[in-house]
């Protein structure tokens, strides 16, 4: 099989690429190394690598010829940078996604798996969060990513392109970003401890997140290439377990001092995924426990 991975040099994308290469597949990677979060990039030299921008349709379109499956992860993928530069967020996450879908349609790609976000649920929905709940977008990031969701559904309904959308819940694991003020909290805490600094906790630290290991996310993406139903639909990819930030800090560095910093606008208070739909239709479920992973580091 031949796969194309947008954002394939980033955190989640590079883990998917490595899995595909290990399984002997042909892989095309598109990534322009765009990041407002000091992210590192990982290019697998066994893939066909292109430092292209998904906003440039004429540049990326020829690469879709002969591709069977597309994993679309290229994005402005952080809340705070999207708030600071909403135009870029819309250009990348909406126009870029439309370009990927149109190129996939033109070249008769079998399936597009789109990576979206649990930020779509906002503040108003009670936990556990279900795919059927209304969107409550609080920032340009969630608005632009959910616009991508609607594009995927439209391309399925109108053009017959098979798409599957994932709403990820706080992905962590190998290659997670650890640098910059917007680094995800697990990587940030680990970096702060390794540097001998206190862990910085936003607000009171009682806000919760559903932390999902990147290996489980990779498995979900692979499962989406094999399912027979669920096209044009959304699936939560999480664990169904919520952990607050103070609990997380204690897991990473028991007894260590934390430094509370002001809350940031546009962020959810509590997240916890209902993953029953993914279990039923994708035959997927998470395997990696957060505390086990931390203790095994």
For each of these PLM feature ranges, what is it?
Residues 73, 192-193, 224, 251:
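Conserved catalytic core of Hanks-type protein kinase domains
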Residues 147, 151, 155, 185, ...:
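Hydrophobic alpha-helix immediately C-terminal to the catalytic Tyr-X-X-X-Lys motif of short-chain
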Residues 159-160, 187-201, 254-261:
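A short C-terminal helix-loop "cap" of Rossmann-like NAD(P)-dependent dehydrogenase/epimerase domains
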Residues 204-206, 234-235, 243-249, 254-275:
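C-terminal "lid/loop" region of Rossmann-like NAD(P)-dependent oxidoreductases
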Residues 289-297:
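Amphipathic terminal alpha-helices
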